[in-house]
Amino acid sequence: MTVADAKKTADQKMQKSIETLKADLAKVRTGRAHTGILDHVMVEYYGNPTNLTQVANVTLIDARTIGVQPFEKKMVAVVEKAIRDADLGLNPATQGEMIRVPTPPLTEERRKEMVKLVKSEAEDAKIAIRNIRRDANETLKKLLKDKACSEDDERRAQDEIQKLTDKFVLEVDKLVVEKEKEVLTV
């Protein structure tokens, strides 16, 4: 492994941490409806647990209602049950072939809990990014010890990895501020 490889690996891993945070934040419910709420709902499809998005079309009907239209008519009841059992606090209602999923408005107390959850997710992401920095720095020290790079190269690479870390931590903070604003908007 070279110094460039260590930096590239750290960058890729930090980017994955950001993507994971974005996915986790998408699951946090806000006052508005969004299709991401149902992304992890699993439906029993011919005996196999299948992602809801693979057995139904999920759309937004309005700001507070999600529409779910199963591809097969006989799946309507199964999909409705899966949404109800997904422990999301949602109560779907069937209208013919369409399942309407109204999202209830969040109480002030629940909004504050959601903000705490968002901050917790962000802190986990920051910890992951810092751990990646630590691993990269250890790799650089090992390269220096093995005389695969000079002290100057190692020092420069550590500085660049620190800049990367700062950049990604700043991105985490930005994502959190956006999500907090979204959660607290009534």
Curated annotation (Swiss-Prot):
An annotated GO cellular component of this protein is: cytosol
GO BP, one example?
A: cytoplasmic translational termination
Q: Which InterPro entries match?
A: Ribosome_recyc_fac, Ribosome_recyc_fac_dom, RRF_sf
Where is this gene product found?
A: Cytoplasm
GO molecular function, one example? ribosomal large subunit binding
Cited function? Responsible for the release of ribosomes from messenger RNA at the termination of protein biosynthesis. May increase the efficiency of translation by recycling ribosomes from one round of translation to another.
PANTHER family cross-referenced by the UniProt entry: MITOCHONDRIAL RIBOSOME RECYCLING FACTOR PSEUDO 1, RIBOSOME RECYCLING FACTOR
Which family, according to the similarity comment? Belongs to the RRF family.
Query: HAMAP family, from UniProt?
Result: RRF (MF_00040)
Protein's name in the database: Ribosome-recycling factor
Q: Which organism is it from?
A: Herminiimonas arsenicoxydans
Specify the taxonomic lineage. Bacteria, Pseudomonadati, Pseudomonadota, Betaproteobacteria, Burkholderiales
